[in-house]
Amino acid sequence: RETTGLICQPAYALHSFWGCHFRCAYCNLGHVAHVYVNVEDWVEHIERSFSELENSPEQNLFQWDNGSDIVCWEPEYGGTKLLIDLFSRQADKYLELYVGKSDHVDFLLDYEHRGHTVCCWSLCHEAQTREVEKRTASMEGRLLAARKCQEAGYPVRIRFSPMVPTVGWEAGTRHMIQRMFAEIKPEVLTIEPLRFF
């Protein structure tokens, strides 16, 4: 918005997977996974839908999949490769791949994304990761994964999400930010408070 100086990047939400194998204390996505198994048909439907969006050329970001840390299920699921291939062929559309709290990215490094896939991490300080976000990658693991993706040419975004006021969170967050800038150069930073749906 011009009057506030804030930047808002609206995006279409793409979902083919709900559920998460992580066990973050604040999250309700765990325990049961709901999966589209006809992922090839789903990706073809997305491609056909692009023509309907020609009247909104400024709307060119598609986020997949906030309902799960989707890369945890890859490459076996197969959706990431199909979507990266699809978006790499688009002149003006971009996929935001929600890597979330994972460090599982080695399968992504050789994909031909042509700069049309953005990798987005949720980053939290180490004490929060250890105490509140069970089964997730460590802060350092996420930063290493983000660096690998950035070195493979992927644009990288970071969400400080959620900000949970654990004991020592201020010092932990300062350290996290210093480590982040020492390892990567994120193109966008987002701060999200703890929230419940």
Feature annotation, model-predicted:
Residues 20-27:
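Short cysteine clusters
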Residues 10-17, 73, 132-139, 163-167:
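Short, charged/polar micro-motifs that form catalytic or ligand-binding hotspots
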